[in-house]
């Protein structure tokens, strides 16, 4: 596994020690817990982004397929069945035109030529898939960092237990 992350997530260092005082050990334990909390927060954020992209990518793909269908049928008319409600469908005769309207979100809809729409949707799909791949890499990296910090915590905690046993004797 690489020791660095291309998106700036700091790597966790494996903590090497020979002897620590109880105060030093407690200080390290606090730092480790803080680092674990930061990594978990980043992980939660990345998981949300992955979920969002998992929702968006099929929609973009479906819209792109529709635009490509319109491009193939340009100038022809065809019948479509569309959903009005959960239990109500309707049929319509549609003539494929040179322009399409794409819903961009935030109450914005723009008119594009079929070629422009196809290029835009292809670019958006590629971008979303690359972002999803990067997010999955980040998740793997973050989970490895959390594991490293948990191992550090366990080692220092076990050392403090050993110190307590020695002081009781």
UniProtKB/Swiss-Prot annotation:
Keyword Chaperone: yes
A GO molecular-function descriptor: tubulin binding
Keyword Chaperone tagged: yes
SUPFAM superfamilies, sorted: Prefoldin
Keywords on record: Chaperone
CDD domains per record: Prefoldin_3
GO CC field: cytoplasm; cytosol; nucleus; prefoldin complex
Gene3D superfamilies per record: 1.10.287.370
GO biological process, one term: protein folding
Family: Belongs to the prefoldin subunit alpha family.
Assembly with partners or alone: Heterohexamer of two PFD-alpha type and four PFD-beta type subunits.
Function: Binds specifically to cytosolic chaperonin (c-CPN) and transfers target proteins to it. Binds to nascent polypeptide chain and promotes folding in an environment in which there are many competing pathways for nonnative proteins.
The name this protein goes by in its record: Probable prefoldin subunit 3
Organism in which the protein naturally occurs: Schizosaccharomyces pombe (strain 972 / ATCC 24843) (Fission yeast)
């Amino acid at each position: 596994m690489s020791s660095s992350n291309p998106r700036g997530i700091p790597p966790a260092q494996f903590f090497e020690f020979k002897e620590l005082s109880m105060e030093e050990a407690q200080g390290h334990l606090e730092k480790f817990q803080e680092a674990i909390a930061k990594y978990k927060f980043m992980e939660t954020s990345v998981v949300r982004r992955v979920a969002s992209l998992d929702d968006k990518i099929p929609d973009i793909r479906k819209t792109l397929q529709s635009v490509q269908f319109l491009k193939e049928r340009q100038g022809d008319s065809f019948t479509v069945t569309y959903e009005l409600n959960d239990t109500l469908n309707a049929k319509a005769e549609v003539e494929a035109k040179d322009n399409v309207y794409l819903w961009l979100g935030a109450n914005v809809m723009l008119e594009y030529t079929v070629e422009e729409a196809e290029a835009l949707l292809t670019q958006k799909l590629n971008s979303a898939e690359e972002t999803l791949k990067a997010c999955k890499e980040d998740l793997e990296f973050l989970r490895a960092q959390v594991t490293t910090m948990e191992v550090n915590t366990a080692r220092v905690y076990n050392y403090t237990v050993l110190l307590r046993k020695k002081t009781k004797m």
